[in-house]
Amino acid sequence: MFKFILKRIALMFPLVIVVSFMTFLLTYITNENPAVTILHAQGTPNVTPELIAETNEKYGFNDPLLIQYKNWLLEAMQFNFGTSYITGDPVAERIGPAFMNTLKLTIISSVMVMITSIILGVVSALKRGKFTDRAIRSVAFFLTALPSYWIASILIIYVSVKLNILPTSGLTGPESYILPVIVITIAYAGIYFRNVRRSMVEQLNEDYVLYLRASGVKSITLMLHVLRNAIQVAVSIFCMSIPMIMGGLVVIEYIFAWPGLGQLSLKAILEHDFPVIQAYVLIVAVLFIVFNTLADIINALLNPRLREGAR
């Protein structure tokens, strides 16, 4: 098992290097000189060759590309993502509070997605082929097909504006989490519930389940055996939903005026504030790699057959 964990962790590093290099290249995605991009982003009215040369020297754009990447990566490893092109403030100071706000929303939403997916998946699998199963799958398919921004808008109009039950936007207290969490749960639970249902159906069709049924084992005991084996899906759901939700919160945070990474990154994109964009992309990508690896390790701990297959 120790070798398996080391192998999984070792595989993370080349992925992080590739992702970080692609993130670094965001500075060069425009056709113009990065120095010109910075000056335009700062609202400089008259971009002269002297200003371009001064900016190139200030930000190290005269160095070879790989040297620039090395310097940027070493700084990023110390959580120093440079300074904002717009405000001149350290990016870490802007990213820090926004990251914590997004992380709290993401964790709460991931827990709700996991609980909802497990409940719906288990009930649907136990009632497969019956009205309850068909109803759950139909509703899940319908809700998954609805755009998140539309669901968010409907909830704001009816719950916040007309009924005046919950705040429409911002982060003013615990009640501010309710509407965004509901929208995120609706968007993702319908997707993950199908994975839980499929796993449960596969487990219910296993030979050991048929044997236990034939032996007269009580339904509750049988369910405990099946749920124990199906828990791997729940682990994967929780681990994978965190980076996926965090990376997909841009629209939700914008609609609810949530002071998080999504809104900050959207503003940075509109302003061409590349250091902020780089920090956002790198954080989300690294979290995705880390939680994916964590899910593999936990699943291998729960299922020795996965370790055998990875050798």
UniProtKB/Swiss-Prot annotation:
One Gene Ontology CC term in the entry: plasma membrane
Residue spans crossing the bilayer: 9-29, 105-125, 139-159, 173-193, 237-257, 274-294
CDD domains for the chain: TM_PBP2
Domain ABC transmembrane type-1: 99-295
Stated induction or repression of this protein's expression: Up-regulated in metal-poor media.
Function: Part of the ABC transporter complex CntABCDF (Opp1) involved in the uptake of metal in complex with the metallophore staphylopine (StP). May be involved in the import of a large array of divalent metals ions such as nickel, cobalt, zinc, copper and iron. Probably responsible for the translocation of the substrate across the membrane.
Name used for this protein in its record: Metal-staphylopine import system permease protein CntB
Species of origin: Staphylococcus aureus (strain Mu50 / ATCC 700699)
Lineage: Bacteria, Bacillati, Bacillota, Bacilli, Bacillales
Gene symbol of the encoding locus: cntB
